[in-house]
């Protein structure tokens, strides 16, 4: 899961697909943390949550690239979680 400034959405989509993801889901989110409160009222204040179901090795590559390219200059959080997929043929 990647939580990032909405301005990164297009770049993140390009990155995760290029790095081996078969798909993703993006939703608008709001919250508060180290980067301040993001309420999504203004376009520049929007935050997105990108969920990617993929093999662990692909997740590692995506996380390394996202951290390398964006973590220094953008509000960004990433985390891994293990899931049980009910329709594995889709992934």
Describe each PLM feature range:
Residues 1-91:
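Positively charged, small/polar-rich N-terminal and surface patches that mediate targeting and assembly
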């Amino acid at each position: 899961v990647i939580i990032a400034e909405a301005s990164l959405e297009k770049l993140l989509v390009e990155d995760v697909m290029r790095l081996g993801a078969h798909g993703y889901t993006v939703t608008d989110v709001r919250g508060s943390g180290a980067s301040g409160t993001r309420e999504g009222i203004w376009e520049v204040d929007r935050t997105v949550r990108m969920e990617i179901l993929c093999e662990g090795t692909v997740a590692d590559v995506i996380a390394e690239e996202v951290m390398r390219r964006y973590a220094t200059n953008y509000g960004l959080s990433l985390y891994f979680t293990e899931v049980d997929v009910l329709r594995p043929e889709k992934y």
